[in-house]
């Protein structure tokens, strides 16, 4: 993408309304724009990051055996009356009447709808296990939306729903998703710690929140330091294998970790003092096993191998992509701006033309842009008329991992500078060497 | 994808509520499920097609120079009061009040919001031309939703919005999108004819509907037969070049074509009788140039090269992906089911194991599945326990372009059958020859 043809409205000033660094940087870099309280547009730069985060989530959901569909945003009130949550959900549910005066709602979550889909098609244990997910907008009418897309009203959620014949099957499903979440957050550059958590309005028997540590987190969390070093399940993980799933789950639940709602002072105090971690955290995922809560109320049953009807056991598993993006920024930035982890950055490489209009600079930039693009990189070429200082500041604040700087003096020797955004390390080399180095490091 | 692990609930019976073939086939094959009147879930098979259609739309939008963002579904009523459309829009607009009693609405389109975004960031002609698009859910509270996702209430729309300094610039933007639409529909296997059209509630001076001919179409259309043979702009089309855009536009508007609202009997009668086409059509795209209608009302101005303020000229450009999917089916099916054009099919190839559990069949299927997958194909392997006849019917109805049939008798000679879904042509060859043939034809 040539910056002269892109739409990336960088703000010169820090927006006053931003209380936390991710919100400030997302507004400054033109990633998002608030349309109404808690309702945001994802501008082109932000949309690129959001797409890449979604792609990672999707890959790991698919790897674990979950299947993607797409449920609508609007739901009929009837479904929620069946489960009993229509009245229970309170003011966070956005209730709507259509032109025929039928009561509807903007889905805050989809347990009811997916259970309705399940019961209408699946009649036999032979079709189990089943895990269906979608990445779809939700609306929760928060009384105090804040921190940009960290706590917004209209937000994107990946929500998966598992169906199993019995509790043992459902626990395997839960552990599959547990392992998939560990992989997902790791690929997003985050160390997320699964913590025992309250089940809230979803309900159920077993629940973990995945929390990343950050000073701006809304939750107070307590855990063992060992979590910082635990291994992440590899790409070759066999999610079908019960023993593997058990081993991962046991490892990652072998140490104390709890949010304040579930905190047990005595258990935490039993940890040697130097190994305790008491910090603030951001919830980036939440998984639930709730047995037959919805399947019972809504009649989701299958014939078992014994020829009898069984009410299915369910779980649900959420990740909020529109919250993950600011969470990643909270975890990865410096005074100059965002530092995107590889694979999530809006562009892989930014080529900075220090003197647009200079023949040698333009030619070298054109070659870098074209060759790196052909090699499969997402390249941003800063071909605008801005002065070099402004271009450097822009490249830093938007956090593209690698900068290739093309200036008139060095290009006279056929050389460019390659800068690593994270470490600040710079290296001077020929255009060809730069291309070869970047392609080799892919 | 192994069918035994996929979720594809094929219905045995034709659903009674379906009046047109696409609706019937989408329900039969488990592509969609109705949740409420005019509100659908896209089940996994349908979601795969929808994703591929969106990918084609996105590629062609990007190629033409448009930039993707993502606006929210809910909008504040205030914005629409500014443009004057809040009262004008009528009952199709879903009006909502949030917990603070603020009037909001589920966006039926985004002219107001994009104009608001534009005016808050763009102040100079130097940032023009600009075309911003998103692919986002819309809601229109149709009095009579019908034909499945062909006319639903919650639907997906790709809507692009162009901003230019003057009318000449806006006409170039209009013609860019005109050419992009020709390419898009062609890649989706459709012959879409641009027809002069009424501008409806969007308003404006110039408008074309892109119509495909189909007996089940809701519009009556009239055009010259020459449209069926016109060339589609190539991949190397230079969208920046005004002369190229003019040439394409002139060619494709050189013959009579109008919907019934804009029909002129006399002009149509002037066409020699054998060259007239009077038929029913499905609208698959609609483009508008409406000058300063919204920019004037909402104060979207830029400084021109003359140092003076200019109210920008705008256009908007819509395609409905959730309507395109059934439109493609209307245009491409036979008595046995859907016939997907290449590139849009939910899977590229289906490997049918006629006797799951038979060692030779299982081994050959495993190899085909693995090798074709590695070659980059989306492969569905029917490894279920169903009888062969049922598997053939399923492969036909879901419309995957190529079937590779592995049966115990032919595999004893090391052979499989390759069937073309569209022509019905079958060829027997070795497993290796089948793989080579399919990879070579990619």
Curated annotation (Swiss-Prot), chains A, B:
Keyword Phosphoprotein: no
Gene3D superfamilies assigned: Anticodon-binding domain (3.40.50.800), Bira Bifunctional Protein, Domain 2 (3.30.930.10)
Subcellular location: Cytoplasm
Reactions this protein catalyses: tRNA(Pro) + L-proline + ATP = L-prolyl-tRNA(Pro) + AMP + diphosphate
A Pfam family this chain is assigned to: HGTP_anticodon
EC numbers for this chain: 6.1.1.15
GO MF terms, alphabetically ordered: ATP binding; proline-tRNA ligase activity
Record keywords: Aminoacyl-tRNA synthetase, ATP-binding, Cytoplasm, Ligase, Nucleotide-binding, Protein biosynthesis
Enzyme class: ligase
GO biological process per UniProt: prolyl-tRNA aminoacylation
Gene Ontology, cellular component aspect: cytosol
Keyword Protein transport: no
Functional note: Catalyzes the attachment of proline to tRNA(Pro) in a two-step reaction: proline is first activated by ATP to form Pro-AMP and then transferred to the acceptor end of tRNA(Pro).
Alphabetized PANTHER family for the sequence: MITOCHONDRIAL RIBOSOME PROTEIN L39/PROLYL-TRNA LIGASE FAMILY MEMBER, PROLINE--TRNA LIGASE
Subunit field text: Homodimer.
Homology family: Belongs to the class-II aminoacyl-tRNA synthetase family. ProS type 2 subfamily.
NCBIfam families hit by this protein: PRK12325.1 (NF008979), proS_fam_II (TIGR00409)
Protein's name in the database: Proline--tRNA ligase
UniProt organism field: Sinorhizobium medicae (strain WSM419) (Ensifer medicae)
């Amino acid at each position: 993408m040539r910056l002269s043809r892109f739409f990336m409205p960088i703000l010169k000033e820090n927006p006053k309304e931003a209380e936390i660094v991710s919100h400030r940087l997302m507004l400054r870099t033109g990633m998002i724009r608030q349309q109404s309280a808690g309702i945001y547009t994802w501008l082109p730069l932000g949309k690129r990051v959001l797409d890449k985060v979604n792609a990672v989530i999707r890959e790991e959901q698919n790897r674990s055996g979950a299947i993607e569909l797409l449920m609508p945003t609007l739901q009929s009130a009837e479904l929620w009356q069946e489960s009993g949550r229509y009245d229970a959900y309170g003011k966070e549910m956005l209730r709507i009447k259509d032109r025929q005066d039928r009561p509807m709602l903007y889905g805050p979550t989809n347990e009811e709808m997916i259970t309705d889909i399940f019961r209408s098609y699946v009649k036999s244990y032979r079709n189990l296990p089943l895990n269906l997910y979608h990445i779809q907008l939700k609306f929760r009418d928060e009384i105090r939306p804040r921190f940009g897309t960290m706590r917004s009203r209209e937000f994107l959620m990946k929500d998966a729903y598992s169906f199993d014949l019995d509790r043992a099957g459902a626990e395997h499903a839960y552990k599959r998703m547990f392992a998939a979440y560990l992989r997902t957050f790791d690929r997003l550059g985050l160390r997320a710690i699964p913590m025992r958590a309250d089940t809230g309005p979803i309900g159920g028997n077993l629940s973990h929140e995945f929390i990343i540590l950050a000073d701006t987190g809304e939750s107070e969390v307590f855990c063992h330091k060992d979590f910082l070093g635990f291994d992440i399940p590899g790409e070759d993980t066999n999610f079908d294998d019960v023993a593997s799933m058990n081993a991962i789950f046991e490892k990652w639940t072998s140490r104390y970790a709890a949010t304040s709602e579930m905190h047990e002072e005595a258990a935490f105090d039993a940890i040697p003092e130097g190994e305790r971690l008491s910090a603030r955290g951001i919830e980036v995922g939440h998984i639930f096993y709730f047995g037959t809560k919805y399947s019972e109320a809504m009649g989701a049953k299958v014939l078992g191998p014994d020829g009898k009807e069984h009410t299915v056991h369910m779980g649900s598993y959420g990740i909020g992509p529109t919250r993950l993006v600011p969470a990643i920024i909270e975890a990865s930035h410096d005074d100059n701006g965002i530092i995107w982890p590889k694979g999530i950055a809006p562009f892989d490489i930014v080529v900075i033309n220090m003197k647009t209009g200079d023949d040698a600079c333009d030619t070298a930039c054109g070659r870098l842009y074209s060759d790196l693009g052909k090699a499969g990189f997402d390249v941003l070429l800063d071909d605008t008329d801005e002065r070099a200082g402004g271009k450097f500041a822009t490249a830093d604040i938007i956090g593209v991992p690698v900068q290739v700087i093309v200036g008139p003096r060095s290009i006279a020797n056929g050389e460019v500078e390659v800068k690593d955004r994270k470490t600040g390390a710079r290296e001077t080399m020929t255009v060809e060497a730069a291309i070869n180095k970047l392609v080799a490091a892919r």
